[in-house]
Each structure stands twice: as structure tokens, then as C-alpha cells.
């Protein structure tokens, strides 16, 4: 599942955002080093926790605190990380491999098309992978930008087809799925954003995309063509950066969660 700022995800998900403040030059190097280590640990925890609700995390922290108290010691970051991982059932090998491929596809296309930064990826869940992506501010909302956005949304499915030759239902099946979001955006491009191939000056509001696409076969065809083009573009990007993509898949599969810095260490040579 793709989480990003312009299209909101489930309201009960908890996202931890850390501010990188590189201007604390008034403090000594030891303090800065300690704060950097703390920030790195928190980023790791935030990445591990993607997909959990606030109530889930509250329960994890409470149980970790009780465990530390019983052992008469202080609570550590490792306790919380262990609690997060213990909260989730073990994901089968083949499913975890598919998750890693899918999320790496999103990440490689997001980075290659310069949509913004990557805060983290995780496949340490039993309900699909999760990623935290941000988008550069101040970019014009042109048809080209929306085309890149669609390519990123279709990239998980494209990656599965490239590597596994089959696709799972993970990119669809829910209101906040990749396919659902991509369909809504492509429909907006046709009817509400002024990019349509027919009557582009009309603003046609639609509260039920399923209903309107089911009734209008021609509109459904135009929307589907946009999605096909986006998937083809994502496929091309992944092939062009196949070496970096393969490295990211392996690293994500092994670690099960990577923060943004770890992802960029892998993708940076392709910038």
C-alpha cells in the first residue's frame, strides 16, 4: 500500500515524522552524535510501525514497558522494536518476497521520476507492504506530473509482472489500494482537471467512480488507457534501473523494514 501526502490514507494509521535539524552546531560533537543515534533509532521504529494503528502502538509500548519493569531495567528501543515484530504473525517466504518486489517497484519509480523523498519501506506485516513517500512541494500540477504519479502507483503491479510474471490482488481490492487511487486520479484527469481527451473544459464532478465508469464504456476505456500507459512507463523505468531495483528487493526482503536513509544508500547511485 502506498501512503503519501496528496492522497490521504486510513485516518487511524500513525505516522511518525522526524525533523532533521542539521543546524545544531552550538552543541558538542558527542551530543550531536548521541542525538543522531536516537533519531536513527526512532526512524527505524517508525518504519517498523508503518501500517499499525495508534492503538496497536500504544499496546506494544505498554507491553514492552511491563516486560522491562518485570526484568527490573529501563525500557529500550530494542524492546519496542521486538514488540512491534512480535505483534505481527510471520509472513510466509513467498508472500514476503512478493511484498518486497511490489514495494521496491513503488520506491524505484518514485525516486527515478523525482516525485519526492522516501521515508521508509516495510514488508513486516500480514496485510501487504507499506511505504511512506513524500512529494516535493511547489511543483506544478500539470498533466505530466499526474502522469508520473500514476506511473508510481502502477509500479508495484509492474514490478510483480516483471519478476514473477503474475500479479496478486495486493494492488487492488480496497478503496485505498493502488488501483483504486490510480483509477480515481485518471478519472479526475478525464473529467475534472482539464486534461480530458473529450470536452476538457468541462468540470464534471463524480462522487461514485464505480457507477460512472460502469455506465460509460467510452470513458472507462479512456481511463483504462491512462492506467495502461502508466504501467508501461513504470515497467520501462524499472527495467532501466534493474540493478538498483534488484538490490533494493534483496535488502528489503532480508531486513523486512528499511528507513529512508537505507533506501537512498541503495538508490543513490542511480540518481
Language model regions located:
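Soluble catalytic regions of large protease machineries
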Residues: 18, 94-101, 107-271
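Short conserved motifs of the RecA-like P-loop NTPase core
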Residues: 13-21, 25-51, 78-91
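Non-catalytic accessory segments flanking P-loop/AAA+ NTPase cores
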Residues: 1-33, 59-62, 69, 75
